[in-house]
Swiss-Prot record:
Homohexamer. ATP binds at G203, E204, P205, G206, V207, G208, K209, T210. Binds 1 zinc ion per subunit. The chain crosses the membrane at residues 4-24, 109-129. Zn(2+) binds at H425, H429, D503. This is ATP-dependent zinc metalloprotease FtsH.
Length: 636
């Protein structure tokens, strides 16, 4: 590919030099100061003995009169009488070959030929370069669009093993079974079993689908063929199907083997959707895949493994038994899984003694394996930036904040008055988190701007919650209202800010779901009303139910929010003095943890109902827990 580009560049350079040389020669040979003259006039001047000197270049005559005037004209080919006349009249005549246009002239025939053929050679070079790009090979593959782009691993395998995959023990068992079958198929066939023809890994981005496939390739003792779904999509009709056939032809030659198709939704999207483009190349590719997986021309020994983030859009024919027999969901890791993943990624990183990976695992609920690896990498970069020899706990905590909330904006210009209001807002959230007995334990409060947030209150639950009772939900609403209520208690109704916008949105949504989704309202009763919000092109919200029912739901939601607001405001007003001390400390240090927060409250005689809690080691805990983080972010 680089050679073809170099050839094209040299074509352009040579062509430019030829054209420049030709123009320079013509410019040098031309006489811009000569006066054009007709041949008849020149003949008359010769007869009148007015010409003293003449220079003949091919078919052009440049004559100099005796009074110093320079004139030029052209003579027809073969007309030589004027030359004889000038010699007869004593004119000094010089003759030289033409500088261009005469192919027979010495040295100019090559230049003329190159000028004539240069456009043809230029277009030929561009065409060859395009063919090499699309064919992805040498000159013999200029038109080989249908060749597969799959990578075949026979001797060289990815250096990833199942031991490098953590946080998905059940999935690893399924994969280990496939490896066992490839190693000893007779043991399974003895019982009449057959291997699955296809395995589909699906889950959210970053959970480890491709990593698991790499581990399978590293463990299996059979050839591994890897290809992306987008490799089958091309601008030419039929190329995708041809590449699909070529991929499976390669697989048959290397059977038994494994074919891994990453991002299969690129070609496996459900058929029948509206296609404004006429012929759908993707559908042809999908049809060919269906035939290859379970058609008349199938062969034994080929295992298809695919990965996707969108199983809901795949064609039903692709998911039926006989094609993808097993569909394995890869979830986000729980707290134990996150702990195991952190240990795997921390093996090659020097950690200080104060690093607690268990606490990091609890502080990162909802994080995928890719997110956790990114956190450890960010922590390593932060430690290197500070010229440390080890990664400390503070580096990991800062890395979590960077990933979750964005970079610190310490240079952001915030007036002392605004900073105080932000501190009051966040202190109100934190106080309600400590005063609600059913709330999740407080972790820390910060007023350092990060991303779009001006402050954040973080809670780290210690128990896994799969269901929530009404008390849990009401506690969440009280905590969300804490920021706005603190502003009103400290500054009055006219002093409230726009910082509670996100809090009110979340509280309203939660209250609506309490009433209309989970049926927890005594007045409305046990009923569930679906509400569809369509933001596309300004779409409106569509809610089921009669107008009277919807009106009753709205009244109950308003009542629930008003009650929570008044109760929250009462609690904050009763502890205003203690909260003022917290605000001063928060303005001074910008970040305080739960322990320091409680110590300040205890100095004012305030007893919290939800103290800071610690959990025993995950190594000793029998049941896995899944903490969830609750962030209250002030967006102004």
């Amino acid at each position: 590919m680089q050679t073809a580009k170099n050839i094209l560049i040299w074509f352009l350079i040579i062509g430019f030099m030829i054209v420049a040389f030709n123009l320079f020669e013509e410019k040098g040979s031309s006489s811009p100061s000569a006066t054009p003259m007709s041949l008849t006039t020149l003949v008359d001047m010769v007869k009148q003995n007015k010409i003293g000197e003449a220079d003949i270049k091919g078919d052009k005559i440049i004559a100099y009169t005796k009074d110093g005037q320079k004139v030029e004209t052209y003579i027809p080919k073969g007309y030589t009488s004027i030359i004889d006349e000038m010699i007869k009249d004593g004119v000094k005549v010089k003759a030289s070959p033409s500088s261009g246009g005469d192919i027979s002239s010495s040295g100019n025939w090559l230049v003329s030929m190159l000028i004539s053929w240069f456009p043809v050679l230029l277009f030929a070079g561009i065409w060859i370069l395009m063919m090499r790009q699309m064919g992805n090979g040498g000159p013999t593959r200029a038109f080989s669009f249908g060749k597969s782009k799959a990578k075949v691993y026979i001797e060289e395998k990815p250096n990833v093993k199942l031991d490098n995959v953590a946080g998905m023990d059940e999935v690893k068992e399924e994969v280990a079974e496939v490896i066992e079958y490839l190693k000893d198929p007779a043991r399974f066939r003895k019982l009449g079993g057959r291997p699955p023809k296809g395995i589909l890994f699906y889950g959210e981005p970053g959970v480890g689908k491709t990593l698991l496939a790499k581990a399978l390739a590293g463990e299996a003792h059979v050839p591994f063929i890897s290809v992306s779904g987008s490799d089958f999509v091309e601008m030419f009709v039929g190329v995708g199907a041809a590449r699909m056939r070529d991929t499976f032809e390669t697989a048959r030659k290397n059977a038994p083997c494994i074919v891994f198709i990453d991002e299969i939704d690129a070609v496996g999207r459900s058929r029948g959707a509206i296609n404004l483009g006429g012929n759908d190349e993707r559908e042809q590719t999908l049809n060919q895949l269906l035939v290859e997986m379970d058609g008349f021309d199938t062969s034994e020994g080929i295992l298809i493994i695919a990965a996707t983030n969108r199983p809901d859009i795949l064609d039903p024919a692709l998911l039926r038994p006989g094609r993808f027999d097993r569909q394995i969901f890869i979830p986000k890791p729980d707290v134990k899984g996150r702990y195991e993943i952190l240990k795997v990624h921390a093996k090659n990183k020097p950690l200080a003694k104060d690093v607690d990976l268990e606490l990091i695992a609890r502080a990162t609920p909802g994080f995928t394996g890719a997110d956790l690896e990114n956190i450890l990498n960010e922590a390593a970069l932060l430690a290197a930036r500070k010229r440390k020899d080890l990664i400390h706990m503070e580096d990991l905590e800062e890395a979590i904040d960077r990933v979750m909330m964005g970079l610190e904006r310490r240079g952001m210009a915030i007036s002392p008055k605004e900073k105080e209001k932000i501190a009051v807002h966040e202190a109100g959230h934190a106080l309600m988190g400590l005063m609600m007995p059913d709330a999740d334990p407080l972790h820390k409060v910060s007023i350092i701007p990060r991303g779009m947030a001006l402050g954040v209150t973080t809670q780290l639950p210690i128990d896994d919650k799969h269901i929530y009772d009404k008390a849990d939900l009401l506690s969440r609403i009280h905590i969300l209202m804490g920021g706005r209520c603190a502003e009103e208690v400290f500054y009055g109704k006219d002093g409230i800010t726009t910082g509670a916008e996100n809090d009110l949105q979340r509280a309203t949504d939660l209250a609506y779901r309490i009433v209309a989704t989970w049926g927890m309202s005594e007045n409305v009763g046990p009923i569930s009303v679906r509400r569809n919000i369509n933001p596309f092109l300004g779409g409106s919200t569509v809610t089921e139910g009669s107008p009277d029912l919807l009106k009753e739901i709205d009244k109950e939601v308003q009542k629930l929010l008003a009650s929570a607001y008044e109760e929250t405001k009462r609690v904050i007003a009763e502890n205003k003095e203690a909260l003022s001390s917290v605000v001063k400390r928060l303005i001074e240090k910008e970040t305080i943890d739960c322990k320091e927060f409680v110590e300040i409250l205890s100095l004012h005689g305030v007893e919290v109902k939800n103290a800071c809690k610690q959990e025993e080691s995950l190594e000793k805990k029998e049941n896995n827990v899944e903490p969830k983080i609750d962030k209250n972010v002030v967006n102004v």
